[in-house]
Amino acid sequence: MPEHRFDLSGKTAIVTGASRGLGSYFARALAGAGADLVITSRRLQALAETRRAVEALGRRALPLELEVCDHASIERIVEAAQEHYGHIDILINNAGVNIRKSAVEVTWDDWNTVLDTNLRGAFFVAQAVAKRMIPRGYGRVVNIGSVTSVFGYAGITPYCASRGGVKQLTMSLADEWGAHGITVNCLAPGWFETDQNRVLYQNEAWVAYLEDRIPLGRHGQPHDLDGAVVFLASDSSAYITGQTILVDGGITTGATKATVQDDA
């Protein structure tokens, strides 16, 4: 396949939740492929490092403050992106939160915080961007999900519910927007160390336990997602839509290295 199929030169991408963690790496990966960026966070000053990284790659970065639970805020940043660059080609719908509590301790406010950010926010950001993509007949929407859309995990029930919702949202939007030249896919990372789960990675026994259940034998590193996010944002994925792409080292196969060894 020609290398230019992965080239994002001339494209503009919005990345939400881009101040740190995987969102910052998504912005860098797209910039490395040639895209100009709109990067968003709840705190504008938190975007400084990501902006520097994008500009160091020779691309432009427009930092904007976004509260995904506020519809007016969503409309403001999408309109600002449209006015600044003239078009929006790619959305990486990444903003998300997690609250760790047992299911019987989750409060009404906890539930609303997670679902409003991870699911309602994802929908209305995608909606606002699609309104600009539809007249052009082109767009790439990449919703960031999780393996928790496939597996349930104790202690993060609202998060699992929200990620399952994102998976279904992806399929529904793909069905509706395909006629307008817009693909909608979900990139679902496995276990990557982030600000949301860093406390778990301080437990060496837990890390070893989980690694034994990952066929590739290790946790994910941010660069492991570069190829997938660029692929889904590029014309190489033009005939792929409504799909959830798991980048998880194989943990969702349901097998373990120990099981294979025992059965051999």
Model-based region annotation:
Residues P2-R5, F151, V230, T241-A264:
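Short C-terminal tail/terminal secondary-structure segment
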Residues S19-G21:
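Conserved glycine-rich cofactor-binding loop
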Residues L44, L66-I77, W108, D224:
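The beta1-alpha1 cofactor-binding region of Rossmann-like NAD(H)/NADP(H)-dependent oxidoreductases
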Residues S102-A103, D110-L115, L210:
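Substrate-binding pocket helix/loop in short-chain dehydrogenase/reductase
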Residues A126, S162:
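Active-site helix of classical SDR
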Residues K131, D175-A179, A238:
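Alpha-helical segment proximal to the catalytic Tyr-Lys
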Residues S146:
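Residue(s) in the substrate-gating loop at a strand-loop-helix junction
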